[in-house]
């Protein structure tokens, strides 16, 4: 694992409590190309059965397993109008939503 990947996973773990109430995971799916169908299915099931807060935790867990998961997540947040959440994760605009 590269050092920046480790840092990205740490950021997701540390900041989850700060954004878990703001994210609706299935709204981000069109922009999260790193997720495989099984990931999306598990996240959607969690969102349907237990709500978006619990589903966000599953989303973060799945993102940490995927290459470029962090970058895709930050870009997806920006594309969906959640700039303030993206800034929590990427305050230096290393990953833009384009």
Q: Where are the language model's segments positioned?
A:
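Death-fold homotypic interaction modules
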Residues: 1-98
């Amino acid at each position: 694992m590269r050092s920046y990947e480790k840092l990205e996973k740490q950021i997701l773990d540390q900041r989850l409590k700060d954004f878990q109430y703001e994210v609706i995971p299935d709204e981000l799916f069109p922009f999260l190309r790193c997720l495989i169908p099984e990931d999306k299915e598990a996240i959607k099931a969690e969102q349907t059965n237990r709500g978006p807060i619990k589903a966000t935790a599953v989303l973060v867990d799945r993102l940490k397993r995927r290459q470029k998961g962090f970058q895709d997540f930050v870009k997806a947040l920006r594309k969906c109008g959640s700039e303030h959440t993206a800034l929590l994760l990427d305050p230096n605009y290393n990953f833009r939503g384009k």
